[in-house]
Regions:
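GHKL/Bergerat-fold ATPase module in large chromosome/replication-associated machines
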Residues: 113, 134-153, 173-178, 183-640
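GHKL (Bergerat-fold) ATPase N-terminal catalytic module, capturing the glycine-rich phosphate-binding loop
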Residues: 1-182, 187, 194, 632-640
Length: 640
């Protein structure tokens, strides 16, 4: 019988290849090893200060281009033989992680530890031909040296190092010799290690790092001095005009400190995100991160320093799945909301300035945050036919035009492309109308009206046939215009226009011949068509969606002709069998499409273009066609 027992064996590992693989592919930038080695030095000093709290820690970096070497020195705790064998000679082992667990268990200062010594030091092999570690631990009679050239073989022996601490000597490969330039080193230290709590010098000059940020100060002489300190810090760091500063103090299960600010940057792209530089225990992990701030905080930038976010293995990103990420993101959102709500109540002039810069994004915040909505909704700005206007001002001005005791109408339209025609309609009737064409705006107006039921009523102009705007005709006028309605419907249908129901109303201004009003069905059709264009669907779903679209297209769109318009009155009087008159009827429809940009699809645009060319050609060919036309020349089958 054949044995079915599985074969067992150990996987073989190419240690030299593994070290190089980790070094070269874990880190995106070659100079990241400077950050890692400075982190190691800082953590070593933190460990020594547990027993010597008054120790003045220092970190020195020296470059020697002639020998292609970089030296990193610190006066930290140092290592003995056991530490070296455990943390330097075992791939994947981290002395800092072990010490952090010990300090946490003892209630110690684990929050000050930054890196992962055994893992982070491997980053040196991104650029190194060889790494030498010389170290002497506090209380030990002698030091040790460890050599490695990026292979499984390493050397460990006694060393005559006199001072306590560690020195790491990196022999830089020729193709990375540019990293030995002092200006480059200083730039790297400032970028990554600006807030390390110990001074870092480069070639004897320094400190290069700032050491402290405003949130590291234990006390300020006054609130004004604190605010000025934060603003000065941000002004030196960012080129933006700062509209307001938001100090961050998050405590509790997860902690974070830092400074956010509201920028003057214009944000036309709805996909723009607010960005922060993320520091973990004072060390830069990610610059310009666009994931930590809430999605609606698009106009906010700043710096966040936290001990609780978990860096990835390469320490160039944070783990978004860790519970700390969602918690800190939520608390940062709370800080932003609380600050803006405070400004709205106590510093309205500053809030109005921010509002004018970022009214769209503030409305997004109000949509997501109930408390923020309640506190600022009256101050939110909307575009109207009289310029930008807060809801409070709109309601006050509209109420002055409303009969006492009746609900104040809040007129709006939901498609920005229709602004021109509805602004003209509103101006002619001395009405205020809101352009609620951006995301959230219509929903916010509905929410606002719901809060003020009985006092305010919503009137959507682009989806209603309101008699207050579109006056009804008398019975005799209806009969007079009925044939024009039928003739125009028939000609539009034969011309390939989507199904349109023509109705005659009387509205102002008189020089506006026609407007198109959306029905709920035609609005749904347009949204469905837009999504079909944007989405890649499976064949089955695509067929189903397009069938639904075809069904919806059978529902007509309303074209309202203006009974007071001279051109419409001329069409009423002319013989509509005349080819030129028919082209004019089509032109009236196209003019309404052009006034409502949201309805101008590619197919509509092509039809408008073709009609214009055709009309121009007819005029050039025979400018007297209308005058010479005789009914007996041709018989046309018109509707009705």
């Amino acid at each position: 019988m054949t044995s079915t027992a599985p074969e067992r064996f150990k996987m073989e590992t190419n240690f030299e290849g593994l070290i190089k693989l980790l070094a070269e592919h874990l880190y995106s930038e070659p100079d990241v090893f400077v950050r890692e080695l400075v982190q190691n030095a800082s953590d070593s000093i933190v460990r020594r200060r547990r027993a010597e709290p008054d120790l003045a820690g220092r970190i020195e970096i020296k470059a020697d281009p002639s020998t292609r070497t970089l030296r990193f020195r610190d006066n930290g705790l140092g290592m003995d033989r056991r530490d070296i064998r455990e943390f330097l000679s075992v791939i994947g082992s981290s002395g800092t992680g072990t010490t952090r667990r010990e300090l946490t268990g003892q209630g110690g200062a684990a929050l000050e530890l930054i890196g992962q010594f055994g893992i982070g030091m491997r980053s040196a092999f991104v650029v190194a031909e060889r790494v030498v570690v010389r170290t002497r631990k506090v209380g030990e009679p002698r030091g040790f040296a460890w050599h490695n050239s990026g292979s499984v073989d390493c050397e460990l022996y006694a060393d005559a190092k006199e001072e306590v601490g560690t020195e790491i000597i990196v022999s830089v490969a020729p193709n990375y010799a540019f990293l030995l330039e002092e200006s480059r080193l200083r730039e790297v230290v400032v970028r990554y290690c600006e807030f390390i709590q110990f001074p870092v010098s480069v070639n004897g000059r320094g400190p290069v790092n700032a050491v402290e940020a405003p949130w590291h100060r234990a006390a300020w002489p006054s609130d004004e001095a604190r605010a000025a300190g934060y603003e000065d810090f941000l002004n030196r760091r960012y080129p933006d005009l700062i509209l307001d500063v938001i100090p961050v103090e998050v405590s509790g299960e997860y902690e974070a400190r830092g400074a956010l600010f509201i920028s003057d940057r214009s944000l036309p792209d709805i996909n723009t995100a607010g960005t922060v530089d993320i520091y973990v225990r004072r060390m830069l992990i990610r610059a310009g991160d666009d994931s930590l701030l809430p999605p609606w905080a698009k106009f906010v930038r700043g710096v966040i320093d936290t001990p609780d976010l978990c860096p990835t293995a390469a320490r160039e990103q944070v783990q978004r799945t860790h519970p700390s990420f969602a918690h800190i993101q939520r608390r940062l959102g709370d800080c932003i909301v609380e600050r803006l709500a405070y400004l709205a109540e106590f510093e309205p002039a500053k809030f109005e300035r921010i509002n004018r810069w970022h009214h769209y994004h503030l409305k997004g915040m109000a949509f997501h945050h109930e408390e923020f909505f309640e506190r600022v909704v009256d101050l939110l700005l909307f575009e109207t036919n009289r310029g930008m206007m807060s809801l409070a001002r709109y309601v006050a001005e509209a109420a002055a035009r409303t009969t006492e005791g009746r609900e104040t109408p809040l007129y709006y339209f939901a498609y920005r492309g229709a602004a021109t025609q509805f602004y003209r309609l509103a101006e002619a009737r001395d009405l205020l109308v809101i352009n609620a064409g951006y995301t959230f705006e219509e929903e916010l107006l509905r929410k606002y009206a719901g809060r003020h039921a009985g006092r305010v009523r919503l009137e959507r102009l682009d989806a209603t046939d309101d008699p207050g705007l579109f006056g009804r005709l008398s019975e005799s006028e209806q009969e007079q215009f009925r044939q024009l309605e039928l003739d125009m419907e028939g000609h539009l249908l034969r011309s390939g226009a989507e199904e349109v129901r023509v109705q005659v109303r009387r509205f102002e201004p008189e020089d506006l011949p026609a407007v198109i009003i959306e029905t709920a069905e035609s609005e749904a059709e347009r949204k469905l068509e837009s999504r079909l264009t944007a989405l890649a669907l499976t064949d089955a779903f695509d067929d189903l969606a397009r069938e639904a679209l075809e069904q919806s297209r059978r529902r007509p769109r309303r074209l309202s002709l203006n009974a007071s318009n001279p051109l419409v009155l001329r069409l009423l009087a002319e013989d509509r069998r005349n080819p030129l008159v028919r082209e004019v009827m089509l032109g009236v429809y196209h003019s309404a499409l052009l006034y409502s940009h949201n309805l101008l699809t590619p197919s509509n645009a092509e039809a408008v273009h073709g009609h214009l060319v055709r009309l121009c050609s007819m005029s050039l060919a025979d400018g007297e066609a209308l005058l010479r036309y005789r009914p007996e020349d041709e018989e046309l089958d018109l509707v009705g």
